[in-house]
């Protein structure tokens, strides 16, 4: 074979390869666009980059296991996600108890699922943390006269539950604190305490556990809080609700094959799901009512 013929043959093989690749890509793209797009959002527990890393694998799973293509649309803060749902910029969202009730006041949303915790129960907790080098703070009552960082005012585990816990368990009110401030993300609260900007902070249990070996200690833990609801707009197709439920309720964390998938997801929902209903969040209503009578407006 001459050199020219060899070059020609190689070029032909390369051309055929890229032609096949392009055709495959076109088919893949066609399959993708053939699915109806559903936009999914979640309360901003962490910085947006971390949120994307922890939530995109769930979108990929839902796209693969339902007749829909799920795309993640992140909000800048807790309040914005309510606007996303109201304006139909997202159809499905993972909310907190407070954001669910706030959304429910403004338009109709339906809770369909709630995540399980590591113990297999559909609850999580608020955790009060302090620096592990701080010898003055060892229990809840030690927070009197101290500075405390809270998460968003719309956060259940980072604002509502810790305030309720302080008021009912320790008799400590906001006026008894040296100062306090709300931050956008739970991991921001943890870092503010680590940096010494605040004596203590209130975060969701998964964040407390993540920072426990990085300089924070756990001071106290709240009563169980009903799991973060996955909600849908009331006008979505029943087929969409059924598809989401089927895909997520079929997972069992004790199944090794399922666990490989679920461990790519955020700690908040990697242990499985249970069905949710509005009355599951009556305890959140109770906390809001109690604090309201004490002059604390939530949100």
Show the residue positions of the predicted features.
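Bacterial N-terminal signal peptides that target proteins for export
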Residues: 1-10
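A ligand-binding cleft/hinge motif common to bilobed small-molecule-binding domains
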Residues: 94-107, 165-168, 191-220, 224
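Short beta-strand->loop
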Residues: 110-121, 176-179, 212-225
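An extracytoplasmic/periplasmic, membrane-proximal ligand-sensing/linker region
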Residues: 32-41, 46-57, 232-299
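Bilobed "Venus flytrap"/periplasmic-binding protein-like clamshell domains
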Residues: 35, 40-63, 75, 98, ...
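Bacterial N-terminal signal peptides
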Residues: 9-19
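Small-molecule pocket liners
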Residues: 123-128, 226-232
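Short helices/loops that flank or line small-molecule/ion binding pockets
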Residues: 79-93, 106-107, 124, 141, ...
């Amino acid at each position: 074979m001459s050199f020219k013929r060899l070059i020609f043959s190689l070029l032909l093989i390369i051309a055929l390869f890229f032609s096949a690749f392009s055709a495959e890509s076109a088919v893949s793209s066609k399959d993708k666009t053939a699915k109806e797009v559903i936009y999914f959002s979640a309360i901003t527990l962490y910085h947006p980059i971390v949120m994307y890393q922890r939530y995109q694998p769930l979108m990929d799973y839902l796209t693969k296991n339902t007749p829909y293509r799920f795309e993640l649309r992140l909000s800048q803060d807790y309040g914005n996600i309510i606007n996303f749902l109201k304006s139909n910029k997202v159809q499905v969202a993972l909310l907190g108890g407070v954001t669910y009730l706030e959304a429910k006041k403004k338009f109709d949303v339906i809770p369909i699922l709630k995540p399980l915790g590591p113990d297999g129960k559909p609850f999580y907790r608020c955790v009060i943390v302090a620096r592990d080098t701080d010898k003055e703070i060892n229990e809840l009552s030690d927070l009197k006269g101290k500075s405390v960082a809270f998460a968003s005012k719309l956060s259940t585990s980072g604002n509502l539950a810790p305030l309720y816990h302080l008021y009912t368990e320790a008799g400590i009110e906001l006026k008894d604190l040296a100062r306090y401030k709300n931050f956008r993300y739970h991991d921001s609260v943890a870092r503010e305490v680590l940096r010494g900007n605040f004596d203590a902070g209130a975060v969701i249990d998964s964040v407390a556990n993540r920072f426990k070996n990085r300089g924070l200690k756990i001071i106290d833990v709240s009563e169980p809080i009903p799991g973060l609801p996955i909600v849908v707009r009331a006008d979505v197709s029943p087929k969409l609700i059924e598809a989401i439920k089927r895909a997520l309720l079929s997972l069992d964390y004790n199944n090794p094959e399922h666990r490989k998938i679920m461990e790519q997801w955020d700690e908040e929902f990697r242990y499985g799901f249970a069905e949710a209903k509005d009355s599951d969040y009556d305890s959140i209503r109770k906390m809001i009512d109690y604090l309201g009578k004490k002059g604390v407006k939530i949100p």
